[in-house]
Amino acid sequence: MKNKLHHTLTRAVLLGLLASTAAAPAYAASSLSKPGQDIEGTLPGAEAGVENNMKKNTATNEVKFLVKNIQLDVEDEIKFNNAEIRDILLARIGKETTLAGLNDLQDQITAYCRSHGYPAAAAYLPAQESKDGNVILKVIPGRYGDVKLDNKSRFKDAAAKGFLAGLKKGEIIRTKDLETALYTISDFSGARAVGTLSAGKSFGTSDVTVHIEDGKPSSSIVYAENYGGESTGRYRYGAQHSIYNVDGMGSKVNVGALISNKSLHNYYVNYEALVGHGGTSLGIGYSRMDYEVSGPLKRLGAHGTADTISVYGSRPIYHTTDEKLALTYGYDYRRLKDDMDAFGAQADSKKHSHDIHAGVEGFWRDRKNGLLLNYNFVLTAGNVTADSTYARQLAKSGGTDGGFTKAEAKVTAVQSLGKQADVMVKLSGQAASKHLDSSEQMYIGGANAVRAYPQGAGTGDKGMLGTVEFRYYTDVPGLVASTYFDAGRSSIDNSTTTLKGWGVGLAYNAPDWFARVDYARRIGLGRALYDSISKDRGRFWFLAGKIW
């Protein structure tokens, strides 16, 4: 009888926990994000560029004549803004000039074309007699002559030539195609790739010599931050080691670890390789996270693990100095286990999930107006299956079992405000087809969200996050001061949480180390998911790391 009563009470307590546990985040859900994401952007990026060694026109004839009209003869393949070209020509029409002045006009038109997608274009004066003041100016786009390789790196010639195979002799030299090839070489090899243009053997052609010089064969980073959750350890310490161009064909290996000051451990390894010659990559990764809950809930004996196997890849559509677009895709398998020892095997939650995802990512830069736009869009379809009795009870109560779809979007815009300031606007959001398992939810509180609230606060199936941040670049190189406003809104079923806050930050970036500190205060109080929120109006965040 006593044993029966014990099981009855235990079952009642567990059922009482269902409502709160199904709606609340898993204790370590905020640590299930992409490993190493807090240090993204701190490692060196691709290095590529185009140099033009073709000579400018020169003339010493100072005989003046009146220019009444300029006829621009452009090959059909060249596309540019007619209004901008017209403004350049109108500055010369109706005025006296010399042959040197016309050569200067040629250089202006040439520079315009080269900065607008045709790096080998050239304007020139064909043989003509201009007795009536009418001048004919021709523009040729520049076509590939010989494409040569000067490889002084560990990246194998065969791999490099594969990227250059699309630069065919006789075709128009376009910035987008040439820089995409150069940046893709740099992305995979870790080397610096520069294309040098020189005069070709025949009129209207340019030879291209691609120089590849070795970069760092590997990089390492160690860092410390306090971006963790309260129950599993706010202070965390991480390390990551990346090896580039492992086999001379562009493959890459990343190994990393993250541990907290309490009882969270996260380890990951991935391998990425080049597939074909178009820059398509395919990788495989494995990560394992384990945790134990501390604090007021420690008496429950809550602990768990998450094992994730990922297959992922990308395909560049184009990549230049000022714009990039790439397709991304992947598959994830997760096995999740969450136990509460205080209730025995009845509180063991075991589940697994599969998902496939595809999206686009890239950036666009408007140098003239000082604007930079980064974007990332992902669509995910998956299935979550409960593997234990307690997990099935949770899934039934919350409606999280079975198939789901979700869409995620992130957009960041940076507008320059003179030489020492800019304003950054960040927007992100998630939409879902149903109530999601906690491993698939978003959260709106934390170091990379509304910074006035703890990590993982405001979890939801769908929601939006926004930040407006003013940044001032001080006279100390690399030191940036900022002030910002964060806001987020998330919802689960009919329950909605809104969080707002403001703060100040100080960041320092050098070639081999980085640091950032933030102090944020909440505005009002969102639906209190944690008692500590109502007690603490301000929060302090830091991140610091060293790169080798």
Language model region names:
Residues 274, 281-424, 428-430:
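Transmembrane beta-strand segments of outer-membrane beta-barrel domains in Gram-negative
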Residues 193, 218-220, 247-253, 277-283, ...:
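Repeated loop/turn-to-beta-strand initiation elements of outer-membrane beta-barrel proteins
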Residues 27-228, 240, 257-265, 407, ...:
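Periplasmic polypeptide-binding modules associated with outer-membrane biogenesis and secretion
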Residues 197, 218-228, 239-240, 250-261, ...:
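Transmembrane beta-strand segments that form the barrel wall of outer-membrane beta-barrel proteins
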Residues 226-228, 245, 257-261, 286-292, ...:
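Transmembrane beta-strands of outer-membrane beta-barrel pores
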Residues 266-270, 293-300, 337-346, 385-394, ...:
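Outer-membrane beta-barrel translocator domains and adjoining extracellular loop/strand segments
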Residues 393-548:
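C-terminal transmembrane beta-barrel domains of outer membrane proteins
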